[in-house]
């Protein structure tokens, strides 16, 4: 059985979209704040082109003989594609170990929050020169938005994608939710 499907069937984790940072912040406290151990964080925010920009930044950094951890979503074929740690993808075993640690917290989380925590736990142990995160569908309340001081935020094209998650359906509201300011 595929690891993502196992998560989807888990009693504590769910597939629903629920934009709220309270759950992940509580989990981070209980995990000892792995996000505070990350330095040189670059966040890629917006609607279209985030993955391409992230991948190009990764290749640029690696081309300059520096290491980078990246978190992308969704994965194309295998869940481990979401987690690049320096010179390799996380293995299924490493992902499962992190999920077990998250399960022990007994906090109901979304699958996206669980996968964000998997990344933060492992990136905090990897000690790379840079960390690059791809934002989820709405940045302001996205579980990746827990880094206090990223060194850069790269904003790509913003459009009216994911309007179904917003009360007001204006481009200004989309910009506010996707970028968190402006």
Name the predicted role of every residue range:
Residues 152-159, 182:
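Conserved beta-strand/loop subsegment of P-loop NTPase cores
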Residues 17, 21, 28-30, 34-38, ...:
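ATP-dependent carboxylate-amine ligase catalytic core
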Residues 42-44:
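Hydrophobic anchor at the beta1->P-loop junction of P-loop NTPases
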Residues 52-56:
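Hydrophobic positions on the alpha1 helix immediately C-terminal to the Walker A/P-loop
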Residues 175-182:
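Membrane-proximal helix-turn-helix segments that form the acceptor-binding/catalytic region
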Residues 1-17:
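Charged, amphipathic alpha-helical linker segments immediately N-terminal to NTP-binding catalytic cores
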